[in-house]
């Protein structure tokens, strides 16, 4: 199961939001992978997420595989949107 998303936080997915994203990804039994520019990165690895260079406007595909894949994609997508709301506060 996959979902295409765009990073909307004007600072991108830098250290603090990346750490929150990884914590969220780790709470699921499903494996979640970020695909961007022909490369794949584990959503459960802070080094992978930071290495993905997820700047503002970056488009990526979240690919989840496992029993709670749909829930994982919902929560991670909502979290990415929340970063935009926090930025505006």
Residue spans for each PLM region:
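C-terminal structural segments of small proteins and small subunits
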Residues: 53-89
């Amino acid at each position: 199961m996959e979902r295409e998303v765009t990073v909307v936080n004007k600072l991108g997915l830098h250290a603090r939001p990346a750490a929150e994203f990884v914590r969220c990804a780790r709470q699921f039994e499903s494996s979640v992978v970020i695909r961007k520019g022909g490369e794949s990165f584990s959503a459960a690895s802070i080094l992978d997420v930071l290495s993905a260079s997820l700047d503002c406007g970056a488009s990526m595909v979240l690919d989840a595989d496992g029993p709670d894949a749909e829930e994982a994609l919902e929560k991670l997508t909502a979290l990415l949107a929340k970063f935009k709301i926090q930025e505006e506060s």
